[in-house]
Amino acid sequence: MQTKPFRIGTRGSPLAMAQTHETRDRLAAAHGLPPEMFEIVILSTKGDRITDRSLAEIGGKGLFTEELEQQLLSGDLDFAVHSSKDMPTKLPEGLFLSAFLPREDIRDAFVGRSAKRLVDLPQGATVGSSSLRRQALIRRLRPDIDVITYRGQVETRLRKLAEGQVDGTLLAYAGLRRLGMEHVPTELLDPEEFPPAPAQGAICVEARIGDDRINTLLAAIDDPRTHEAVSCERGFLATLDGSCRTPIAGYAQSDGTHIRFAGMILTPDGTTSHQIEIDGRAADAERLGQEAGERIRAKAGPGFFSSWS
């Protein structure tokens, strides 16, 4: 019988804390445990501390996970809670993504200062985003506006917008909903036209391979449909060596038996893009994503990535 609290690792941002509290509450309810049986351990990551440069410049997605993973591997944490889209496709040896919570809305949200929609921004307007995918998609749709790198927590980005530093910004709608800020967006973007990042809107829990006690605990909150969809999307990303240096979009939908995936790769300036759609058995989700990646890479040709990466 567990007598000491389970130690949950997380970043300290308001969004990370909201995701961790949701995970803790689901675990407590699933196992009939009081919330006090889960101790939340807040760690600062390099990605949190360096906010004046793009992720591509300072090392990519692993900057939000490295400190948490070190504590997991040392045994100081029992598991860690992350935004799935922040996770590198290659994890440290001995760790894996044990569980995925039911997925939130996958869409991107536009927040405009004056213009309510992305298409309504005047020529020469400025939009801030830290995501190469969002930057490329904006340039694809609106080559007449300026896109600047714009990092920070959700609240920081919205404050900069209110101060007039930019005319608009894009945020994951899932994050806004988790923060109780679903009223903030002025437009929700159609994923057919503005596809999300792979794994966007999904919370994942990272744990040690072979830690049966913890992984049995986490299995109670794992959502199979989300697990299948995100596995497919991460398979696509991994095949394309996806990181914060690559504009890659994609999302999968699973009904438990069948899964459909749509993906896109773009040049950073948004002038060239390639798309892929594929479907298959949900049981083959990761392999299906890998196949989609192989097909779109062949479609784009060998010079596509080397021409700008």
From Swiss-Prot:
Q: What class of enzyme is it?
A: transferase
Please report which protein family the annotation says this sequence is part of: Belongs to the HMBS family.
Query: What organism is this sequence from?
Result: Rhizobium meliloti (strain 1021)
Protein name in UniProt: Porphobilinogen deaminase
Cofactor(s) essential for the protein: dipyrromethane
Kindly tell me the pathway this chain contributes to.
Answer: Porphyrin-containing compound metabolism; protoporphyrin-IX biosynthesis; coproporphyrinogen-III from 5-aminolevulinate: step 2/4
Question: Gene3D superfamilies of this UniProt entry?
Answer: Periplasmic binding protein-like II, Porphobilinogen deaminase, C-terminal domain
Q: Quick check: keyword Transferase in the entry?
A: yes
Q: How does it assemble?
A: Monomer.
Sites of S-(dipyrrolylmethanemethyl)cysteine modification? 244
Which controlled-vocabulary keywords does the entry list?
A: Porphyrin biosynthesis, Transferase
The annotation note on the cofactor reads: Binds 1 dipyrromethane group covalently.
| Chain coiled-coil ranges | none
One Pfam match: Porphobil_deam
Give a Gene Ontology cellular component term annotated to this protein: cytoplasm
**In which domain of life is the source organism classified?**
Bacteria
Presence of the UniProt keyword Transmembrane in the record: no
Q: Which reaction does it catalyse?
A: 4 porphobilinogen + H2O = hydroxymethylbilane + 4 NH4(+)
Give the matching InterPro entries. Answer: HemC, Porphobilin_deaminase_cofac_BS, Porphobilin_deaminase_N, Porphobilinogen_deaminase_C, Porphobilinogen_deaminase_C_sf
GO MF, one example: hydroxymethylbilane synthase activity
Q: Which PANTHER family match?
A: PORPHOBILINOGEN DEAMINASE
Give the Enzyme Commission number. Answer: 2.5.1.61
Q: What else is noted? A: The porphobilinogen subunits are added to the dipyrromethane group.
Give a GO biological-process term.
protoporphyrinogen IX biosynthetic process
Name the job this protein performs: Tetrapolymerization of the monopyrrole PBG into the hydroxymethylbilane pre-uroporphyrinogen in several discrete steps.
